[in-house]
């Protein structure tokens, strides 16, 4: 009788633990706010950076700058940040992305085919035939 009560108590504790995990998910390291301003002086002190996508676990797109022991979340649309990332790419021998993170998804049309931007050099086809 006492063993059955102990087993029942253990099962109840396990169930309670499982439901509390579902209600209160583990804390993640997502940015919840982004700054829309960043100084050039701050960018000089960046040791590394990473990209947070607005899919999956995190709801906000951000570039996370690591400065000393701090994480600073910046809007990925910030003009100064974009210029710094382009300049850093050149310094890093043309690496695709200075910050680690997921690559941008390819553009797809309604049928799921990957689309590319068409670049035309010189005149257009219909003008050349005239």
Swiss-Prot record:
An example GO CC term for this entry is:
extracellular space
Kindly give the Pfam families that the UniProt entry links to this protein.
Answer: IL8
What are the UniProt keywords, alphabetically?
Chemotaxis, Cytokine, Disulfide bond, Glycoprotein, Secreted, Signal
User: Which residues are connected by disulfide bridges in this protein?
Assistant: 30-58, 31-73
Map out region (Disordered) in residue numbers: 92-130
Stretch forming the signal peptide: 1-16
SUPFAM superfamilies according to UniProt: Interleukin 8-like chemokines (SSF54117)
Where do Basic residues bias regions lie? 104-124
Query: In its keyword annotation, does this UniProt entry include Signal?
Result: yes
This chain belongs to the protein called: C-C motif chemokine 28
GO terms under biological process: immune response; negative regulation of leukocyte tethering or rolling; positive regulation of cell-matrix adhesion; positive regulation of cytosolic calcium ion concentration
Q: What does this protein do?
A: Chemotactic for resting CD4, CD8 T-cells and eosinophils. Binds to CCR10 and induces calcium mobilization in a dose-dependent manner.
Family of the protein in this entry: Belongs to the intercrine beta (chemokine CC) family.
Q: In which tissues is it expressed?
A: Mainly expressed in testis, epithelial cells of normal colon, kidney, Peyer patches, lymph nodes. Also found in lower levels in brain, spleen and lung.
Give the Gene Ontology MF terms in alphabetical order: chemokine activity
């Amino acid at each position: 009788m006492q063993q059955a009560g102990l087993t029942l108590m253990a099962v109840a504790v396990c169930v309670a633990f499982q439901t509390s995990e579902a209600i209160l998910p583990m804390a993640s390291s997502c940015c919840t706010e982004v700054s829309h301003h960043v100084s050039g002086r701050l960018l000089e002190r960046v040791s590394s950076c990473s990209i947070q996508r607005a899919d999956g676990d995190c709801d906000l797109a951000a570039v996370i700058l690591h400065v000393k022991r701090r994480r600073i979340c910046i809007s990925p649309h910030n003009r100064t940040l974009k210029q710094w990332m382009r300049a850093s790419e050149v310094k890093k021998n043309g690496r695709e992305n200075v910050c680690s993170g997921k690559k941008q998804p390819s553009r797809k049309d309604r049928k799921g085919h990957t689309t590319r931007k068409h670049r035309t050099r010189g005149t257009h086809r219909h003008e050349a035939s005239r």
